[in-house]
């Protein structure tokens, strides 16, 4: 039976790793973004550290059509069965780990350790990052004002100005971040006025962009999009109120309209004089 067009466009990307598989998954999603019309299914198999587990994976994936295998396996004896399986089944197979290791080996004339998960060794920087992530969750949306005094960065902004995703992104850079949603005529915690203005980032947005984002959010929840929340007059009032607060605080202001989380975060890091806090 001939494949339908949908079946031809379907790709099952198999990700096999002896660690978490995040690197392989990131590479896969970045590459898949080049094929918007393809139906991409991701099937992740992390922590495959022995041949018995690997044999089970290879047996399971045999049932899927249109396979592409992406693997990140440190040890040669784990790589060979995958390569053999792919060759026997005429499957595209990509090793994202070995070429880089080989390039470094050839340049340095050193022998690799073949230590699984070496890039994720539990050093102090790792624990600091976990602590920063926990801090961001604990002090999201102004849950506890004391977090503002302990934070490296405090994000202020009206609803839908990317406060939470920015907090988590910066936390991954080892920064302790707290954020506060701004609503007109609501009390601003006194702690906001007690911290260094340089640590405060005021987030704003274009009214039309904010209107569209909020309307789409209401639609996604199955609600009427034409409410006070998405009303242009209300949005303008919110933004003007926020802008007045930023001026009073003397803080750095960023318009997040048409900016990715990464771009906004880069501006914040530059403002703080941090090149790469995650190093």
From Swiss-Prot:
Q: What's its top-level EC category? A: transferase
What does the record give as the reaction this protein catalyses? Answer: N(tele)-phospho-L-histidyl/L-threonyl-[pyruvate, phosphate dikinase] + ADP = N(tele)-phospho-L-histidyl/O-phospho-L-threonyl-[pyruvate, phosphate dikinase] + AMP + H(+); N(tele)-phospho-L-histidyl/O-phospho-L-threonyl-[pyruvate, phosphate dikinase] + phosphate + H(+) = N(tele)-phospho-L-histidyl/L-threonyl-[pyruvate, phosphate dikinase] + diphosphate
Q: Which UniProt keywords apply?
A: Kinase, Nucleotide-binding, Serine/threonine-protein kinase, Transferase
EC number(s) for this protein? 2.7.11.32, 2.7.4.27
- InterPro entries cross-referenced by the UniProt entry: Kinase-pyrophosphorylase, P-loop_NTPase, PPDK_reg
Q: Where does ADP bind?
A: 157-164
Query: Is Transcription set as a keyword in this record?
Result: no
Among the GO molecular function terms of this UniProt record, one is: phosphotransferase activity, phosphate group as acceptor
Family label: Belongs to the pyruvate, phosphate/water dikinase regulatory protein family. PDRP subfamily.
PANTHER family in UniProt: PYRUVATE, PHOSPHATE DIKINASE REGULATORY PROTEIN 1, CHLOROPLASTIC
The job of this chain, per UniProt, is described as: Bifunctional serine/threonine kinase and phosphorylase involved in the regulation of the pyruvate, phosphate dikinase (PPDK) by catalyzing its phosphorylation/dephosphorylation.
| Protein name, as recorded | Putative pyruvate, phosphate dikinase regulatory protein
Species of origin: Lactobacillus helveticus (strain DPC 4571)
């Amino acid at each position: 039976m001939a494949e339908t067009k949908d079946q031809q466009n379907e790709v099952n990307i198999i990700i096999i790793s002896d660690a978490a598989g995040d690197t392989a998954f990131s590479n896969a999603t970045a590459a898949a973004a080049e094929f918007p019309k393809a139906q991409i299914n991701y099937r992740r198999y992390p922590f495959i550290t022995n041949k018995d587990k690997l044999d089970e994976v290879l047996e399971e994936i045999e049932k899927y059509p249109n396979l592409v295998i992406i693997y990140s396996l440190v040890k040669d004896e784990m790589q060979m069965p995958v390569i053999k399986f792919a060759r026997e089944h005429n499957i595209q197979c990509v090793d994202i780990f070995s070429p880089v290791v080989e390039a470094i080996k050839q340049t340095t004339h050193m022998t690799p350790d073949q230590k699984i998960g070496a890039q994720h060794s539990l050093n102090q920087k790792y624990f600091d990052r976990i602590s920063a992530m926990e801090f961001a969750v604990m002090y999201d949306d102004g849950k506890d004002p004391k977090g503002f005094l302990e934070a490296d960065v405090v994000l202020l902004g009206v609803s839908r100005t990317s406060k939470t995703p920015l907090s988590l992104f910066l936390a991954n850079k080892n920064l302790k971040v707290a954020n506060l949603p701004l609503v007109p005529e609501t009390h601003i915690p006194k702690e906001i006025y007690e911290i260094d203005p340089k640590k405060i980032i005021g987030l704003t947005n274009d009214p039309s962009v904010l209107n569209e984002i909020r309307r789409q959010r209401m639609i996604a929840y199955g609600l009427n999009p034409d409410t006070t929340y998405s009303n242009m007059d209300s949005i303008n009032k919110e933004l003007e109120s926020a802008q007045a607060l930023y001026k009073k605080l003397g803080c750095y202001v960023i318009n997040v309209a048409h900016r990715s989380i990464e771009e906004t975060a880069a501006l914040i890091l530059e403002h703080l004089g941090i090149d790469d806090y995650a190093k």
